[in-house]
UniProtKB/Swiss-Prot annotation:
Organism (species): Bacillus cereus (strain ATCC 14579 / DSM 31 / CCUG 7414 / JCM 2152 / NBRC 15305 / NCIMB 9373 / NCTC 2599 / NRRL B-3711)
Catalytic activities: an acyl phosphate + sn-glycerol 3-phosphate = a 1-acyl-sn-glycero-3-phosphate + phosphate
Gene Ontology process terms (BP): phospholipid biosynthetic process
Pathway(s) served: Lipid metabolism; phospholipid metabolism
EC number: 2.3.1.275
Record's keyword terms, sorted: Cell membrane, Lipid biosynthesis, Lipid metabolism, Membrane, Phospholipid biosynthesis, Phospholipid metabolism, Transferase, Transmembrane, Transmembrane helix
Record carries keyword Transmembrane: yes
Gene: plsY1
Keyword S-adenosyl-L-methionine among record annotations: no
Protein name: Glycerol-3-phosphate acyltransferase 1
GO CC terms, sorted: plasma membrane
Assembly mode: Probably interacts with PlsX.
Length: 182
């Protein structure tokens, strides 16, 4: 059962997810809305396509740090891995479906990566190894990245997390795969 402090933290996590790095950077640097540029997605990939590698890196880091901070603070305050995974889900949902932007956010991958590193860096390193193998096979980022993300629940089991925490990780994966389906 979630107590009132945890509930408030989940709401805050969702709202923090609403902070879209790509939107902020393009508004500050170019006074434009990235959602009107390129693919229209306020994420690192679109920023890289429209403005170059530096903007990709800045957006990736901003969104990843957002996920990492939410998860790291949750680990410190609450310690329960299941609740911490729930906060990762909340910040990702906030990034993908931000109420502040009428539900039109990014695809959640950068936020997921940052949050996962803060959740359990060993799982993140394991997934990095899996990604490298698939990257060498497919010679691209998208397909290996999505395959790697889909391996998270297996890693959760291998690293002895509870079934509930593993199911939450699976929900995160289904959500990310759904918004990245095209």
């Amino acid at each position: 059962m979630i107590n009132s402090m945890q509930f408030l933290y989940l709401v805050a996590s969702y709202l923090i997810g609403n902070i879209l790095t790509a939107y902020i950077v393009t508004k500050l640097r170019h006074n434009v809305d990235i959602r009107d540029e390129g693919s229209g997605n306020p994420g690192a990939r679109n920023m890289g396509r429209v403005y170059g590698k530096g903007y990709f890196i800045a957006t990736f880091l901003g969104d990843a740090i957002k996920g990492a901070i939410v998860v790291a603070v949750a680990k410190y305050l609450f310690e329960d891995p299941t609740f911490v995974m729930l906060t990762l889900l909340a910040v990702i949902i906030g990034h993908i479906y931000p109420v502040l932007f009428k539900g039109k956010g990014g695809k959640g991958i950068s936020t997921f990566i940052g949050g996962l590193i803060a959740f359990d860096y060993l799982i993140a390193l394991t997934l990095l190894g899996i990604f490298i193998v698939f990257y060498l096979i497919f010679k691209g980022f998208t397909k290996p990245g999505l395959i790697t993300i889909a391996c998270l629940p297996i890693c959760m089991i291998l690293y002895s997390y509870s079934i509930v925490t593993t199911i939450l990780s699976g929900i995160i994966i289904v959500l990310i795969l759904y918004v990245n389906r095209e």
